[in-house]
Amino acid sequence: VTGLLLDTNVISMFAPTKVVQNKAFADWLEERETHEGVFLSAVTIHEIVKGAELLRARGATAKAKLVDAFLQELMTHYEDRILALDAEAGVEAGRLEAKAVAAGSAPGAADAMIAGIASRHALTIVTLNLKHFQAFDVPLMSPEEILP
């Protein structure tokens, strides 16, 4: 497996609750999907569900329903390109997170798991938060780097 692993914040750029969506980046991403692999992680699914449930808990049920529908579209679109945290990715995530913590960083388990999945599958993480992933020493790119 080679290609790109989209971080949750990149997928969130296209959520129906966002006011501004980046059409140029969406076009770039669509082109990548035809020529190389573009993947999501199960961690991203978790984070989106968590976000929807927190909206619901705060009484923002209409917004939560939009996020639910968005999630269903994502899961259909990326159906066989949603990568799980299997045992090998879990081991890699643990190693990467421990190395980052030992170096004085506090990356968080979700980002460590995304990095572990990316490392396990030799993918480049596309993220808006490069800083969150730099301690993991995995290939990264930002939408801002990709487009002028």
Task: Identify the meaning behind each predicted range.
Residues A15-K18, A52, E97, D137:
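Short, flexible helix/strand-to-coil boundary loops that buttress conserved ligand/catalytic motifs
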Residues V38, I82-A84, L140:
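Conserved beta-strand scaffold positions in the cores of enzyme catalytic domains, especially
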Residues T2-G3, K50-L55, T76-V126:
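Active-site neighborhoods of divalent-metal-dependent phosphate/nucleic-acid chemistry enzymes
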Residues D7-N9, E47, D111, N129:
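Acidic active-site catalytic centers that drive phospho-/nucleotidyl reactions
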Residues S41-A42, D86, N129:
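Helix N-cap/beta->alpha junction signal
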Residues I11, I45-I48, G90, F133:
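A generic structural signal for short hydrophobic patches within well-formed alpha-helices
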Residues G3, A115-P148:
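Acidic, PIN/NYN-like endoribonuclease modules and their adjacent C-terminal/linker elements
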Residues V1-V43, L54-E73, L147-P148:
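Short, well-structured N-terminal submotif of metal-dependent ribonuclease cores
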